Amino acid sequence: MVMEEKETIQEKTKKPEKKMKKKKKAEITVKANKKGRHVMPLLNFIKAIVVPFYWLVKPFKLYGNKKVQDGPLIYVCNHYTLMDAVYPAVTTSEGIHYLAKKENFETPGLGFLIRKVKGIAANRDGNDVRAILDCFKCLKNGEKLCIFPEGTRNKTGEEMLPFHHGAAAIAIKCKVPIVFVLIYKKPRYFRKTHIIVSEPIELTEYYGKKLTDEELTTVDERLRLRMIEMRREHTEFLQSKKKKKTK
């Protein structure tokens, strides 16, 4: 009887177990301001502070579409260094969501920064449903996305690495334009890098169609070849400019 009373007292005085709160996933989208533009103050701050210092050691010059239109679109950029994210950013005062490999999010410092500027983590093979849905969400909210379709930094002598699936499929599904950002050559210290920015293109002939993997590969290759062509066009432009100077 005494034991039963003790057990009853213990049950009454026992503190209820605290339920573990689930960590709420941070909202990936950015609200539009009064002018209807999606601005990331932190990204603008980084551009204002970091870009001038970066330009001193690795100067660059923009060619082509220096001021990209407001609204949803996908930047497609080739990839040499971690600082390549700078080049699309300087073409707009709106925010950009960068699609980055998951490993970058685990890197101390870099991972914190990517999360703070609303980066999207993805597997390198492009088969990441959650990442793709986040991309859709941002574009449908009227925001910009940047994809490096080579999937990794180009450390080879090749003009352009093969493109992974992603950029074309997302642009077609969301019916948004693509803007190419071509880094003409690998950025080097104290040598000017040429950055060529295209006018927006739309893959309207594929809108509303369900494409096979093979068809998407063909469209991805079309994007890749266009960037290679942009490099050749710029080479011709520089050569003609040089000839005029020698006359």
Range-by-range predicted roles:
Residues V2-H38, I132-K247:
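Non-catalytic C-terminal accessory region of glycerolipid acyltransferases
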Residues P59-G64, M83-A85, I132-D134, H165-A167:
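A generic local structural motif
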Residues K25-K67, Y87, P108-V117:
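A transmembrane-helix-recognition feature enriched in membrane-embedded lipid enzymes
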Residues K67, Y80, K185-P187:
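Short polar/acidic secondary-structure junctions
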Residues I49-V50, K116-A122, T152-K155:
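Short, basic, glycine/proline-bearing loop/turn elements
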Residues L62, L99, I120-A122, V181, ...:
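Hydrophobic residues at beta-strand termini and immediately following loops
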Residues Q69-G126, D134:
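Catalytic core of membrane glycerolipid acyltransferases/transacylases, capturing the structured
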